[in-house]
């Protein structure tokens, strides 16, 4: 998917909702690159580029609807032939017994053709708006590429506030 100019590779088990989320993103103006089978090549600059095979290009399988042609249904602006892969989002089933990164400080990567791509695992459950989460992840990646890391900046502010509070408490104890 091309989400806000960021090439997003969606991963997850069958039936997790990847195609439905992609369809919702297309309806919001984002673009399909490939569904189900993404072919990937590594460029000489260690960039990854993904595309769909000619056989399934511009097509998507949606449970209950069957195979649909995104280009015919939504127009040429809803698809693109290839896109650099810049972010991997793995949709996983929500499990209350598991601990999930709530701050966004865990930086994971997903290796593709020996290139390390930033990875986020997004827990999904009924009622979660997965396409909005994907869009926010792409927006956050855009900020990170520009040097703005919200989670790190928050952690730094929190660390400073705690250090200041300890310093004030120490001064109060000394006086």
What are these regions, as identified by a protein language model?
Residues 31-90:
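Conserved nucleotide-sensing/catalytic segment adjacent to the nucleotide-binding pocket
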Residues 7, 14, 44, 54, ...:
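A broadly conserved detector of short glycine/acidic/proline-rich loop/turn motifs that flank catalytic sites
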Residues 18, 58-59, 126-128:
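A short local loop/turn or secondary-structure capping micro-motif enriched for an aromatic residue
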Residues 4-33:
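Glycine-rich phosphate-binding P-loop
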Residues 10, 50-51, 119:
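Short capping micro-motif at the N-terminus of alpha-helices
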Residues 86-175:
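Conserved NTP phosphate-binding and transfer environment spanning the P-loop NTPase/kinase superfamily
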Residues 1:
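Pre-Walker A adenine-sensing motif
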